[in-house]
Amino acid sequence: MIKGVGIDSIEVERVKKIVAKGDSFAEKVLTPKEFAQYQKMKGKRKVEYLGGRFSLKESFSKAMGTGLGKYVGFQDVETLWDDLGHPVMTSTKFDGNIFPSITHDNHEIITFVVLEEK
């Protein structure tokens, strides 16, 4: 049974400005494993990754019906890749199945998350 659906978007230009300021925002938003992946990236890919992970966490919190804040924090949600390069999302705040989707172009990053109860 579907528990929730969340969608979010962020402008690439906004993320570029954040990345240019250094790693403090990335360290706040990304889990240690996500941050380790982020540090290996450069340029456009780094912007897409940070923006995508931020937006996925927003989408997850919307699907939970809480938004980011008191119940769901940045460190409660992690998205890594499986062996085929698909995003795999886990959370300490939800025990069911999580289906993330992400797309981006030169202007926008859009994410979508579906939560399914077990």
Swiss-Prot record:
The keyword Transferase applies. The keyword Ligase does not apply. Mg(2+) binds at D8, E58. It holds the Pfam family ACPS. One of its GO terms (cellular component) is cytoplasm. One of its GO terms (biological process) is fatty acid biosynthetic process. InterPro entries: 4-PPantetheinyl_Trfase_dom, 4-PPantetheinyl_Trfase_dom_sf, ACPS, Ppantetheine-prot_Trfase_dom. Keywords: Cytoplasm, Fatty acid biosynthesis, Fatty acid metabolism, Lipid biosynthesis, Lipid metabolism, Magnesium, Metal-binding, Transferase. GO terms for molecular function: holo-[acyl-carrier-protein] synthase activity; magnesium ion binding. Its EC number is 2.7.8.7. Belongs to the P-Pant transferase superfamily. AcpS family. Transfers the 4'-phosphopantetheine moiety from coenzyme A to a Ser of acyl-carrier-protein. This is Holo-[acyl-carrier-protein] synthase. It comes from Lactobacillus helveticus (strain DPC 4571).
